[in-house]
C-alpha cells in the first residue's frame, strides 16, 4: 500500500498504570466522584470480573482492566496487613 509505513509501533503503558496501588486509588477516586460506593463496586468487580462495576469516568475502567484481578487482591491484602504491623 503506498504511503504506509512498515515500521512497528510499540505501545507502552505509563509505569503508574501498572502499579496496582495507584490504579486502585485512581479507580476509587473516580467511583467516589461519580457518587458510587467505591468499596461495593470494587468488590463486585474483583468477585465477578465484570468491568461494568467500574465507571468509565476518568478512564477508571480501562485502568483497572490493565491489572489482573489477583494482583489487585494481592495489593489490597498486602496493604491491609502492612497497616496492622505499624
Curated annotation (Swiss-Prot):
Pfam families in the record: IreB (PF06135)
Q: Which InterPro entries match?
A: IreB (IPR009309)
- Where does the source fall among the domains of life? Bacteria
Per the record, the similarity remark reads:
Belongs to the UPF0297 family.
Q: What's the name of the protein? A: UPF0297 protein STH1998
Question: What organism, scientifically named, is this protein from?
Answer: Symbiobacterium thermophilum (strain DSM 24528 / JCM 14929 / IAM 14863 / T)
Organism ancestry: Bacteria, Bacillati, Bacillota, Clostridia, Eubacteriales
Amino acid at each position: 500500500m503506498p504511503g504506509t509505513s512498515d515500521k512497528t509501533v510499540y505501545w507502552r503503558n505509563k509505569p503508574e498504570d501498572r502499579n496496582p496501588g495507584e490504579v486502585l486509588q485512581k479507580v476509587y477516586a473516580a467511583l467516589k466522584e461519580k457518587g458510587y460506593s467505591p468499596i461495593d463496586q470494587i468488590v463486585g468487580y474483583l468477585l465477578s470480573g465484570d468491568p461494568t462495576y467500574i465507571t468509565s469516568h476518568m478512564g477508571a475502567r480501562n485502568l483497572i482492566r490493565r491489572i489482573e484481578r489477583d494482583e489487585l487482591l494481592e495489593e489490597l491484602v498486602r496493604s491491609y496487613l502492612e497497616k496492622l504491623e505499624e
